[in-house]
Amino acid sequence: MISKPKLKLGFFVTLQKTKFILVNYLSVENISKAYGERVLFENISFGINKDQKIAFVAKNGSGKTSILNIIAGLNNPDSGQVVSRKGISVAYLAQKDNIDPTLTIEETIFATDNKILSIVNQYENALKNPDDSEAYQAAFELMEQYNAWDFETQYKQILSKLKLDDLTLKVGKLSGGQRKRLSLAIVLINKPDLLILDEPTNHLDLEMIEWLEAFFAKEKITLFMVTHDRYFLERVCNEILELDEGKIYKYKGNYSYYLQNKEERLALEATNLGKAKSLFKKELDWMRKQPKARTTKSKSRTDDFYKIKEKAHQRRKDHQVQLEINMERLGSKILELHKVHKSFGDKKILDGFDYVFKRGERVGIIGKNGTGKSSFLNIITETAPVDAGKVILGETVKYGYYTQAGIEIKEEQKVIEVVKEFGEEIPLTKGRRISASQLLERFLFDKKKQYDFVEK
């Protein structure tokens, strides 16, 4: 016989489950967007909640930037709506900025509606006029009242980390990379509730990217971003939102989790497609044997047949860019640099630099922003002169130089017209040639897209 255990008096601790309340910042409800006959996406829906750090992934040309523009309020969907929580602040880092080129960096930073920034600006202006004690006292009291001291320290740190040290520089005099970093600094300094980012790591060197990763890790900020930097995505984002074949898929994890689960999803889809094809074959045989006079039961089965047919004939549109380059025979001499010097004012880029490029080498150039990487490329491609030394190019060598600025494109041109300006045909390996249209197809521009205007 098992005796009943004796109960001892003591303390009872009640464990309560912590309730996590999801605070929705923004909801995308059944939005669609098309340009002419080209449908980017149709009836897609998703939400962005507080503290989520979401990466939005999709194939090129499927409308990632269009979606960012829509949720940022810069563009309207053809149908559906975007509903945002009342009172939240939203900031958007677009690929192209609209900063006033006549302002200085400092003026640009303070030309926002941020109240704390306005107070910091007032305080810093007061410091420049020490004789006006009343203005200084008023500014000091506001800094105390709004506890703006930490804010001042942080905004200066952000500018420093992004190498925006000379605040007197005019925006119009900045390089493309500096303007991008200034745009990033502005959205970070303003501390929005929801931050939308389009390629945030463009024009950032490794040190800046690592700092930005750490910044997002410690800051309580909600992110929705598009980036091709998979390592940045892996370290920053805690959720992946994918637009694939017109459908939205959610993955609650980082990029590695997404890759693993997407592979499993595609494998399951392939299995289901195989089953659908087998069932379609069976039902097709039944359809062919059926008499014209149908019963109610057979009519129902016939209706199901057409649904099965549609499912069995689904195909994934997986395209990959395939490149072939016609390489002409090279001589023994490729490119040589001998005792090359290059400076911009007091800043030395190259100081007696020597290097002999060998056939088949694949050389990467790394360095912090502003150290002269682009200048070095301009020197070896002979688009910029050297101060001293020699750059010797082999007689059979031809350059292909893709710059950050790309090529000049007129927006009123069609895509196919831009390519044809460089040639109607493109030489490939083994003496083969393809047309400009075929080249564009290899870069995922189908026949319809080729006749779209560049501005679209």
Each language-model region and where it sits:
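A short, surface-exposed helix-loop junction/capping segment
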Residues: 133-142, 281-289, 318
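ABC ATP-binding cassette signature C-motif
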Residues: 9, 14-273, 323-456
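Intracellular alpha-helical coupling/juxtamembrane segments of multi-pass membrane proteins
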Residues: 261-294, 298-304, 308-315
